[in-house]
Regions:
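Intrinsic disorder in cytosolic terminal tails and internal cytosolic loops
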Residues: 1-19, 471-555
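Transmembrane-helix bundle of Major Facilitator Superfamily
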Residues: 2-195, 344, 352, 356-359
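12-transmembrane solute porter fold
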Residues: 21-43, 56, 237-244, 251, ...
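Interfacial helix-cap and linker-helix signal at transmembrane-aqueous boundaries
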Residues: 48-49, 80-81, 165-173, 228, ...
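Membrane-helix interface residues
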Residues: 84-85, 139-142, 172-173, 209, ...
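Glycine/proline-centered helix-kink
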Residues: 129, 150, 155-167, 221, ...
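Hydrophobic transmembrane-helix bundles of small-molecule transporters
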Residues: 171-284, 290, 308, 457-458, ...
Length: 555
């Protein structure tokens, strides 16, 4: 049964209402499918390699094929969500993720598994930006901080639980079950979404889809991503890599020109008008490149060099899960009180410290409980503290700096940046650290490469903290009045209200004083899920603008 809610209800949902809780469950579970799959496969790599006879290059492509299609299409996915409906595209993404998951589970060869993973990336490109866009466009402004903080904590926990769940499934059954797990989760998400999530879209997007922009964006991201994968490892001839890079750069240049003149651009130029949006995405790229390297190598290192079982290797990161669950929402609240600059400086520096502590883990460390407590636990505790301090503030900063009506596109851009960063790390880090050939099966060689890799990732993470200190403003997440909201779908857009001086925050409690009380509703009674609006209408969020009438670049 589909929900009776329409776009008219969007933007008025109360977080603690039954509908608000169901919507959060749908977006968290949907996002968890993508986040879980991104981390659970790392634990399965040794088992996959043994079962299908894959070498190091093929195992890297098991990861990279997913990231390649995800990075290439995620911008288009965000644009489709804003244009055709966030609930519709989110649901389609869940379906397109489930079906290839079954193909992954039955893949008899590495080649088929790589293709199936690429198809999974297509589904993830549709559902990933849609989840945050649903939160930003359906909850009332005052409740978005609580919603985004809880979403960040629970999806972070899903990422951290991936290695544990994957390790248990591999030990108890087979690596193939890590993909079958997506089927029941997906069915639950589809049922909840159809019944409880209202539809919303950007009412200002009109006319046909910008097909030329879509093709250029996809070709550009795919070409550059392929070059980033194959360039460092030398898996393809130099001319092939150079051609892919050239085509990618040319396509993105053409995309930039096309979007300036398109009637309904996939990537509205105004999204990049905020310097804080650019800075937040730059910090995202640097920090997530470091995280991608650690998540890729740590569980493999623990299994190969220290003799951990898949379950034990996954459970080794359990403190990260607990810290994410306990501290992510508090990190968002801290960012609201003191500004995001402090947590985005301290968090990456703590991550770097945790990576340096991983240098103490060596082949002779042992795998007993006492050995874990002495060598592994201190590193993952500091690392987890840094992760919990960083994730919610950097996501909130990126989304709060972009216009509210472009929430799907802004989420797509930020997700694309983080995925390309992780992909770059997976491709380049083994080469830079001297890991190649059969080193993933040699305990001593892998340990040497792992230590070199941790030095590189620590330097990257520290650089991200310094970049945040230099470029992120403390008032980015400042509070704001409710943004002007466009009329619901199937109606003519209603006149917009006065542009608010600051965009509404995405995480945490507003720093600035609350706006003046709204005028009473001119008819109608607020329901349990939707408080009274300022004009008696139930409208989807419209543009918060890029600052006030004075043109200042406020968030």
């Amino acid at each position: 049964m589909k929900t009776h809610r329409t776009a008219a209800d969007a933007g008025d949902i109360v977080f603690r209402s039954p509908t608000g809780r169901w919507m959060l469950a749908a977006t968290v579970l949907g996002s968890a499918m993508g986040f879980l799959d991104a981390t659970v496969v790392n634990v399965a790599l040794p088992a996959i390699g043994r079962d299908v006879g894959a070498d190091v290059s093929e195992l890297q492509w098991v990861l990279d094929s997913y990231l390649l299609t995800l990075a290439a299409l995620i911008l288009l996915g965000g644009s489709l969500a804003d244009r055709y409906g966030r609930r519709r595209v989110f649901t389609l993404g869940v379906v397109c993720f489930m079906i290839p998951s079954v193909l992954c589970a039955v893949a008899p060869t590495a080649g088929i598994l790589i293709v199936a993973r690429a198809l999974q990336g297509v589904g993830a490109a549709l559902l990933t930006p849609g989840s945050l866009a649903i939160i930003q466009s359906t909850y009332r402004s005052a409740d978005r901080p609580a919603a985004i903080g809880t979403w960040s904590a629970l999806t972070g926990v899903a990422s951290a639980l991936g290695p544990i769940i994957g390790g248990w499934l591999i030990d108890a059954f087979s690596w193939r079950w890590i993909f079958l797990l997506n089927v029941p989760i997906g069915l639950v998400v589809i049922a909840i979404t159809g019944r409880h999530v209202p539809e919303s879209r950007d009412p200002h997007v009109t006319g046909r889809l910008d097909l030329r922009g879509a093709v250029l964006a996809t070709a550009g991201l795919a070409g550059i991503t392929y070059a980033l994968i194959e360039g460092p490892r030398g898996g393809s001839p130099l001319w092939v890599t150079a051609t892919a890079l050239g085509v990618g750069l040319a396509a993105l240049a053409g995309f930039a020109v096309t979007e300036r003149h398109a009637a309904g651009p996939i990537l509205p130029p105004g999204v990049f008008a905020s310097g804080q949006f650019l800075s937040a995405n730059a910090v995202t790229f640097v920090v997530y490149a470091a995280l991608g390297g650690v998540f890729f190598l740590l569980v493999v290192f623990l299994q190969t060099s220290l003799g951990y079982s898949p379950l034990a290797a996954g459970a080794a990161s359990l403190p990260v899960t607990l810290l994410m669950l306990a501290l992510s929402s508090r990190a968002g609240a801290l960012a609201q009180r003191v500004g995001p600059r402090l947590p985005l400086t301290v968090g990456p520096l703590l991550l770097a410290a945790g990576m340096l502590l991983m240098l103490r883990i060596d082949v002779g460390a042992g795998r007993g409980v006492a050995d874990y407590a002495v060598f592994v636990l201190p590193a993952v505790l500091v690392f987890g503290l840094g992760l919990a301090t960083t994730v919610a503030p950097v996501t909130a900063t990126a989304l709060a700096a972009a216009p509210a009506t472009h929430s799907g596109v802004a989420s797509g851009v930020n997700n694309a940046v983080s995925r390309v960063a992780q992909l770059t790390a997976v491709a380049a880090l083994p080469v830079l650290a001297g890991i190649g050939g059969k080193d993933f099966q040699d305990p001593g060689a892998l340990a040497d490469g792992f230590h070199t890799a941790m030095l590189i990732t620590a330097a990257l993470s520290a650089a991200g903290g310094l970049l945040a200190a230099a470029t992120i403003r403390s008032d980015v997440l400042a509070g704001a009045p409710e943004p002007a909201r466009a009329a619901p779908a199937r109606r003519q857009p209603a006149p917009e209200a006065e542009p608010c001086p600051y965009e509404c925050p995405v995480a945490g409690t507003p720093l600035r004083p609350a706006p003046a009380p709204a005028k009473p509703r001119q008819g109608g009674t607020p329901g349990p899920d939707r408080p009274g609006g300022t004009d008696g209408t139930h409208e989807a969020p419209g543009p918060g603008g890029r600052g006030g009438a004075d043109g200042t670049d406020e968030a």
